[in-house]
Amino acid sequence: MSHRKFSAPRHGSLGFLPRKRSSRHRGKVKSFPKDDSSKPVHLTAFLGYKAGMTHIVREVDRPGSKVNKKEVVEAVTIVETPPMVIVGIVGYVETPRGLRTFKTIFAEHISDECKRRFYKNWHKSKKKAFTKYCKKWQDEDGKKQLERDFSSMKKYCQVIRVIAHTQMRLLPLRQKKAHLMEIQVNGGTVAEKLDWARERLEQQVPVNQVFGQDEMIDVIGVTKGKGYKGVTSRWHTKKLPRKTHRGLRKVACIGAWHPARVAFSVARAGQKGYHHRTEINKKIYKIGQGYLIKDGKLIKNNASTDYDLSDKSINPLGGFVHYGEVTNDFVMLKGCVVGTKKRVLTLRKSLLVQTKRRALEKIDLKFIDTTSKFGHGRFQTVEEKKAFMGPLKKDRIAKEEGA
């Protein structure tokens, strides 16, 4: 009986079983950072949309290292993060079996893009969501009931979370249904958290009020789907020798005669990608401001630095491929993140206390690349391209027709 001569570690991790399609499209926060009442009241998570990647040049600030004070080129991901709108407050009580919801209070006015989340087919529906609930805020009995609810939450709740949704109308996506999630409020006492959340009902919360420059965060999302794949692609098992009968990209032995079934740990073909994953320790290189109007002019230069003073936006020439233009606030993260373009990502504050030097390093960007990401881009701005290419034939024809 033939057998392999040497043992080897198994291919692929069993820690992520079952490898099947995620049941949810938006990344779920399974645990929030530990609360610290000595800190000011703040949110612990935010939603963003993956736009694409580019690269930056920066000077390393790591005394004692060989690369200290030297320039490095690093890949970065741009995540568009328009302000989120707070539309509800949820109070939780601690029980022997974990957290249980105590009371949920929604705002008086809720936008249609948020209401769409409560319907499967908005077009055919009667669009009656929250019509009865909003009357609570208008009559005297309802107002008294809401006050009683707020006071009971202050008395009994240990954890306060807000319900916030994204603003799809600000994004270059076709989707109209907003993404909705609960975000835990940390810092201060329960009464301070509740007052903070109540003040911000129906208000927008920008990303720079949640995260800061050079902060380490976690990214939660669903990976890019690959469909049904064979065992070699899915588990990275070794290909069999060339002369193998009935295929090479297979597992030769899937188990013993008895027990007369295939063990769960044996690599098999099946779904690859579209899995729910959490990546920790992604460093924020820049929190950029969206387009704004100042003195009647549209200000776009959110990609210029102290070393590169050219007037350019974060968008590469032609926009981000398969996404479009980033016109809102954005977060620049080091390296890559899960998911395809347009994928909704959950950004969460780190659960760990960061002490490593790389985590605490100050980032000073020298240059942000804005060349076209479709082909081999050469030009940083449209003006630079025009100066190099000279007058074009189409411009001359348009000028002649105008004359």
Curated annotation (Swiss-Prot):
Please give the chief subcellular localization of this protein.
nucleus
Q: Cite the residue spans of the region called Disordered.
A: 1-38
Q: List every position bearing N6-acetyllysine.
A: 136, 286, 294, 366, 373
Give start-end positions of Basic residues composition bias. 18-31
Which keywords accompany this UniProt record?
Answer: Acetylation, Cytoplasm, Isopeptide bond, Methylation, Nucleus, Phosphoprotein, Ribonucleoprotein, Ribosomal protein, Ubl conjugation
Give the PROSITE patterns listed for this entry: RIBOSOMAL_L3 (PS00474)
Per the UniProt record, one Pfam family is Ribosomal_L3
Entry PTM:
Constitutively monomethylated at His-245 by METTL18. Methylation at His-245 regulates translation elongation by slowing ribosome traversal on tyrosine codons: slower elongation provides enough time for proper folding of synthesized proteins and prevents cellular aggregation of tyrosine-rich proteins It is not required for incorporation of RPL3 into ribosomes.
Compartments reported by the entry: Nucleus, Nucleolus; Cytoplasm
Where's the Glycyl lysine isopeptide (Lys-Gly) (interchain with G-Cter in SUMO1) crosslink?
Answer: 294
Q: What does this protein do?
A: Component of the large ribosomal subunit. The ribosome is a large ribonucleoprotein complex responsible for the synthesis of proteins in the cell.
Query: Which protein family is it in?
Result: Belongs to the universal ribosomal protein uL3 family.
Protein's name according to its UniProt entry: Large ribosomal subunit protein uL3
This chain's source organism reads: Sus scrofa (Pig)
